[in-house]
């Protein structure tokens, strides 16, 4: 069995599920999952867990993510991104400066509340929102709290001849953030219709775009029996507090017994040497093995 983490560069035009399906065929391994859905049009880092690493994938999805994208001011779309149909157009504000945009972007820092877009996989009454949207049905969408730790403009304002304005941005955000909704809400705060015209995920769960592999690159390496694209399972627990255990504690964990450890963290990644051997969960004053990986 193959075990480990893959830093996949998902290309535009495929869903996260498509990427997993292709890797299952390529690696001849059924036990593969991804750490955080990317929309089909979005390029970027998609953490992939293989074999035993699928047992820690949930801890990768909790990690914050970094995106780089582009906002277009002047019209909104059904999907809040460039793939949708135009819903409304508006003239740019009489005064639209880089200083005003920057100042407005700072108002989104910290904890904010978002309403997920209709074209999203959020479920309401057992159905995904995009199913309601495609059927032309309206439904009340649940608002959610997310955290924005960075939101900044990374290019000058580019005014076009057809009355639009575009600029690039970078955002660091918590799990569950809809960046296209952030682009729409920014436009609303500036008093103009808007949408997200480009997006790529540049970092997720400690993995970066610079070191990511495309499916084509992985296929080429597999054909040469080269597996260096596969990272150790330890990458999957990089965001959990680490606790090094001794031989006696290792034996106790292997039997599923509780341990008394000097920590107050709700979850710990237990290491024996350089290897992660279990995820421990705080129960009263002791730690119980939640997932044993040996």
Curated annotation (Swiss-Prot):
Reactions accelerated catalytically: uridine(55) in tRNA = pseudouridine(55) in tRNA
SUPFAM superfamilies, per database record: Pseudouridine synthase
Active site (UniProt): 39 (nucleophile)
The organism's place on the tree of life at top rank: Bacteria
GO biological process, one term: mRNA pseudouridine synthesis
Keyword Isomerase on entry: yes
Function: Responsible for synthesis of pseudouridine from uracil-55 in the psi GC loop of transfer RNAs.
Record-given protein name: tRNA pseudouridine synthase B
Organism: Streptococcus pyogenes serotype M1
